[in-house]
Amino acid sequence: MRRLDDTGPHPPIKGAGLRLAVLSRGPRLYSTRRIVEEARRRGLRVDVCDPMKFSLTISDGSVDVLHKGEAFSYDAVIPRIGHSITQHGVAVLRQIEQLGMWTANSGQGILQSRDKLHASQILARNRMPVPKTAYVRDIIDVEHAIEMVGGLPVVVKVTQGTQGDGVFLRHTAFEVRNLVQGLLLTGKSV
């Protein structure tokens, strides 16, 4: 049996001075620490960079990225952009992409993954199985939406959210209508 930390059939990456930046607000988070540990174990030089400490400049034919006032230049970037700073983090990541640095995830990919409806549309377009989904913007469409997805009970989701936030199980049409109405009134997409 192979251990999870086994490098498997792929030879270990030889860092030889390669520089890796991990964009993360939480250097003490387990996932960030593990990325740093593995990168160092493989000989890479790695820094954790807070996405909120970046400045971006754009001029005719030129873009630049500064982190804490210093020029930002790495061979590769692993973004760990939290939901609360998605827009800013993606703006930073897009500028990094413009400079030609390799990124593990694109800014566009992060945005697509944060929108549950858009992610489902992409999966369906690529013939990946997805649960039956209905998107409503008016309370009058709730009954039809329940029928379209196969009846009760239903899972109601807001399109934006991570780690289960904005996901609700409802067993009656009355519960679904009340929930959807409340979410729509607060400006959520359902």
List PLM regions with ranges.
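Active-site nucleotide/adenylate-binding loops and adjacent lid/helix of ATP-dependent enzymes
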Residues: 12-13, 17-25, 30-37, 46, ...
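Short, compositionally biased "basic patch" segments
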Residues: 35-41, 66
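N-terminal ordered "arm"
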Residues: 42-48
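N-terminal glycine-rich "phosphate-gripper" loop used for MgATP/nucleotide binding
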Residues: 51-97, 104-113
